[in-house]
Structure formats: structure tokens, C-alpha cells
């Protein structure tokens, strides 16, 4: 091609949008692939590789070699909404939002219970603030709209926070207020 060499791979770092859908906008869907890095990229050791329906073995091999050269652990996901990590993670974050909204426990207790009880580095509400509540809502919406499964219905509290412009750390307000030295719960 005029802009993209005939051997070039076109990759998307999308965290949830189906690769086959994105590949339809590319000049050559055979060279289109999902290469999902996790934030912060220098710290996180995983790359999720997602093959679209038309993606060739040669394209997968180029991306596999690239990921290995970066020293990352690779996992291969089928082209399904949310792939592996966000298909599992976003329902957990969303359920934490439902639990908070329904008064099951306080923010801190939900985070502490999941952090210590599940041996996670942080609780789901803290993680949502780190990812960005707008991003969490967007991914949850992709899961819900793509599958039609009510288990992916976004929590009203998550929607409310995003509508209020509370996106988490990037706006200094989400489930926690980050304006001071120590984050404080906003509820």
C-alpha cells in the first residue's frame, strides 16, 4: 500500500472491541490483529493477543515474536467481546459498583475484602479509579451491547459517576477523592 507496507501488521490495543469488527475498516483484514497491553505497560508483564476471523498465521507469528522480544507473557484470546481479562475483570468491577450502590458495604470494605480475600494488589473500586471510570463504563457497554447478556448491564452508580465527570484518578475524583495526600472515599 501507499501508506502501509505490504508486510506491515496493523494492530489495535483495544481492550474490548471485537477485532473482526475493527479489521473491516482496514485495507487488509488478514494483517489486522489485537495486541492488548495492560497499564502501566512497563510494569505489567502480559500481552493479550487476539486474532480476528481473517488474521493470518503469519500475522500472529510476527506479533508473537514482538511480544517475546519485549519479554512479556503472551496469552491468546478468541475474538470475543472483552477477550480474556476484561471479560472477567469488568463484571467484577461492575458488581463491586452494584454492591456499593445497593449498600452491601462501604467502599473501603469492598476494596479491602477483595484485595485481601482474593489476594489482589488492590480492590476493584481502587482499580476502577486507576483504569478510569469512563473506560470501565465503555468496556462494560461493549460487553453488554455485543452479547446482549444482562449480566453485563452497567451498574447505575458507575453510569452516574461518569455522567458527573468523576473518572477516577485522572480527574482526581471517582470512588475516591485524590485531591489530598491520602485518597478518601467519596461516599
Stretches found by the model and what they are:
Residues 1:
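A short glycine-rich, Lys/Arg-flanked "PGG" loop and its adjoining helix->strand segment in the class I
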Residues 4-5:
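Helix-to-beta-strand junctions that scaffold the AdoMet/dcAdoMet cofactor pocket
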Residues 9-78, 83-87:
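Rossmann-fold dinucleotide-binding core
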Residues 42, 88-92, 120:
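Alpha-helix N-cap/N′ positions at the starts of helices
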Amino acid at each position: 500500500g501507499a501508506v502501509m507496507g505490504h508486510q506491515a501488521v496493523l494492530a489495535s490495543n483495544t481492550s474490548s472491541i471485537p477485532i473482526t469488527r475493527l479489521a473491516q475498516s482496514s485495507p487488509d483484514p488478514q494483517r489486522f490483529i489485537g495486541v492488548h497491553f495492560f497499564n502501566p505497560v512497563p510494569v505489567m508483564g502480559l500481552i493479550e493477543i487476539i486474532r480476528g476471523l481473517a488474521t493470518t498465521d503469519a500475522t500472529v507469528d510476527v506479533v508473537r515474536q514482538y511480544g517475546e522480544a519485549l519479554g512479556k507473557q503472551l496469552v491468546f484470546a478468541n475474538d470475543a467481546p472483552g477477550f480474556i481479562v476484561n471479560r472477567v475483570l469488568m463484571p467484577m468491577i461492575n458488581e463491586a459498583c452494584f454492591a456499593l450502590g445497593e449498600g452491601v458495604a462501604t467502599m473501603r470494605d469492598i476494596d479491602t475484602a477483595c484485595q485481601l480475600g482474593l489476594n489482589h494488589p488492590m480492590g476493584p473500586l481502587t482499580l476502577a479509579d486507576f483504569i478510569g471510570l469512563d473506560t470501565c463504563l465503555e468496556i462494560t457497554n461493549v460487553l453488554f451491547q455485543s452479547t446482549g447478556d444482562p449480566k453485563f448491564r452497567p451498574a447505575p452508580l458507575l453510569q452516574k459517576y461518569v455522567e458527573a465527570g468523576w473518572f477516577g484518578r485522572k480527574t482526581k475524583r471517582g470512588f475516591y477523592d485524590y485531591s489530598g495526600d491520602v485518597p478518601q472515599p467519596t461516599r
